[in-house]
């Protein structure tokens, strides 16, 4: 795999949306009641977004998208990731590269955050691996 992560395009969102993981679909439905496509296209509506695509094999194509969008609160950025089940085929490379991309996403912000559905165990473990801190649990929905 030559280029694993690159700057995302709206076309990438259209390619990834039909194959987003069920846990991610459930999470964006619970939090914002939107479709995967709408969630993936949302960052492109923000001026200071950083949005990247994770590319698998030639057959897999786009297997994930992630990035950061500005928050209304100064110094805060909202980090996010949506992926397909195919990302599991690239776990080692994904985990190895994550810290540098989190650093890239955080360059313009003092804090990165997001809300995670507690049922999304994979996302919670990933954030724990990246040393994100759990601040509080809030009821939602």
Feature names for model-found ranges:
Residues 22-41:
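Conserved GNAT-fold acetyl-CoA-binding loop/helix
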Residues 41-55, 62-64, 110:
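A short helix-loop-beta-strand connector motif used in the catalytic cores of GNAT acetyltransferases and
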Residues 53, 60-71, 76-80:
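Conserved beta-strand in the GNAT
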Residues 115, 133-141:
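Conserved catalytic-core motifs of GNAT/GCN5-like acyltransferases
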């Amino acid at each position: 795999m030559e280029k694993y992560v690159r700057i995302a395009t709206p076309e990438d969102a259209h390619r990834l949306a039909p194959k987003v993981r069920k846990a991610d679909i459930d999470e964006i439905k619970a939090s914002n009641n939107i479709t995967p496509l709408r969630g993936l296209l949302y960052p492109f509506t923000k001026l200071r977004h950083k949005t990247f695509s994770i590319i698998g094999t030639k057959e897999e194509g786009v297997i994930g998208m992630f990035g950061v969008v500005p928050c209304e609160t100064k110094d805060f950025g909202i980090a996010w990731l949506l992926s397909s089940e195919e990302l599991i085929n690239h776990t080692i490379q994904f985990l190895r590269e994550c810290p540098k991309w989190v650093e890239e996403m955080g360059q313009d912000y003092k804090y990165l955050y997001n809300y995670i559905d507690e049922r999304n165990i994979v996302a919670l473990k990933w954030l724990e691996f990246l040393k994100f801190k759990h601040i509080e649990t809030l009821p939602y929905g």
